[in-house]
Amino acid sequence: MQRAASAFAVGDFRKSEELCKAALSMRSDHLEALSLLGILNARAGRVEEAAVLLARVVQAAPINAVAHNNYGNILRDLRRFDAALASYDRAVKLEPAYAEAHHNRGRLLSELNRADEALSSYDSALKLKPNYAEAYYSRGVLLHELKRLEEAAANYQQAIAINPQLADSHYNLGNVLRDLRRYAEARQSYDNALAVKPGFAQAYNNRGNVLQELGRYEDALRSYEHALAINPDLAEAHINSGNVLQELKRPDEALGSYRRALRLKPGSELLLGGYLHTKTLICDWSGVEGETAELHRRIAQGRLAAWPLTVLALIDDPALHRQIAELSAKGDDPVNRLLPPIIGHAHHDKIRIGYYSADYCNHATAYLAAGLFECHDRAAFHLVAFSFGPDKRDAMRDRLSTAFDQFIDVRAKSDREVAQLSRNLEIDIAVDLKGFTRDARPGIFAQRAAPIQVSYLGYPGTMGARYIDYIIADETVIPAKSRPHFTEKVVYMPDSYQINDEKREIGEAVSRLSLGLPVSAFVFCCFNSCYKITSSVFDCWMRILTRTPGSVLWLLGDNATAATNLRKAAEAHGVDSRRLIFAPHIPVAQHLARLRAADLFIDTLPYNAHTTASDALWAGVPVLTRCGESFAARVAASLLINIGLQELITTTEAQYEEMAVRLARQPSLLAEVKSKLLKNRRTSPLFDTKRFCRHIEDAYTQMYSRFCAGMDAEDFRVQKRKQAQ
């Protein structure tokens, strides 16, 4: 048996097995041979055979702690957890100083979600064997699962200090550092893991993820390529390649990556949604109807098949929107919160408002809300901006950095650290301006950054989260029939929920000729992102063009592939593709100026124009919308009601088509609508920033008064003020 043990030690498992069998052929009850052969069978995946062998050892040597420990390992592999725990308990009872048995017992208890007992077992193992690297590693894994990130990192670091050759410790340390948003350190940990284990595909994959977070997209792509060279079937690396290719504005290649991932692992979280979003981004509608039905089915089954924002653009169903939001919020649920509940929060004469966003720069949210931040009554409110987006030094960033009492860059802080900072600053009301949009940080609010937490502006739907108390809305975007589909208490603004900045600059006038538009044609436009253009919307647009000879459709040139696909689709409808004209992205003031060259903005469904509708109305261009069921499908209607253009709200495709054709065919009707718009633009609530600011301050005051009185959050309506004060 010494030769068998030696062969095992050097990795010659075949030789070791032969020698064990030879020993057993001479003596069938040879315990050492039975034990080692059981371990060899387990290593080879023959777990049932291993269990039989190790059971014989335990029966023959009932007071052998090692035998009970080994048998416990096999029972754990067989998922016979109660029996496994009994074996480990027997092992440590027989030999209380048996560190390995304490460690294995801890691993099993961790699997059983008995975290406190598992930690106690790990502590026992480490007390007995202070340089037990594997126990520190296992303790780190459990602490990571418990979201005790700093402690997890310390345990992985201790394991590495004892044994620098543990690749998994380097790798998992990288994962914790990534979660702590310490991306450069995380990358170094992945590099360390790869130095120990060059063929570690998952380490290359996660290394790519942190490089992506650092904005090093080409480097991230190369890291994913390394992962796939090692393991071409690693679905996560295909998915992440798709994500980074999206960032690199290479949607065609991204689609290919998602397709490969779907073949390998079709049920991956978020994958079907990411694939569909990419298809709609390039206006590739082939198979989308069936794929959307499958997405709906998966969400209805309780599967996180898409990011909530993706679903808003595909399916007009408020109940489904709530379901996908709740599934998304589950990962940040308060049960995972580490910070204790807020107790004894100080009351302030000035209400302390925290606005949380990644978009304090040239971004749609900033264009809308800049005036709000500047108009707040500083005698009654103290404003703090928490910025977790890139530090883009543009004109809007410069403007916003002076619009708050405090402007804090929290990019490098973890969700828990941001929440703790908010508590230290005694923020009364935390306003999430992101929701489930790009670069969102819902984990901050799951940690309860403030006693009152509000969803506003960024995400047009419910967050589905117990930690969000209120949503700012209006009677149009959340009508009574939709109220059951929102988990938040609803604050109904007296006018539109959407803030607008009355200071927005419109550039110098530009001619149609300079924009590549026909001088005398009727110009329909839609500057929504391409993913909002569905095949049914485009079909309707083509019927409108067919019925209005000589008209053109002016669209945003999101990407070349989308333009190509839309031109092909136009030709398939018998419409000359030259009647589709694509505009490049340009600075906002110039964009507002060029918008005036259009005659009519025609909206999309189920995801309406939001900021783009406000842009058009501010520029004096009427917006024709079709109002749907969900928040995202009703925003343009809210805007039109509050600028006095209800006649441009339709509820069916036929109404929408007929109104577009009428406005194109009847110049006097269009002129009347435009005249009304220009008159109302300066007098209606929609572009009265100060009036809106006073109303939302009234909302904040009522929220805070309820909190100070010990009352729970409830729906309420903000009373309309006659004029800004």
Where are these predicted regions, by residue range?
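A conserved nucleotide-sugar
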Residues: 380-382, 542-572
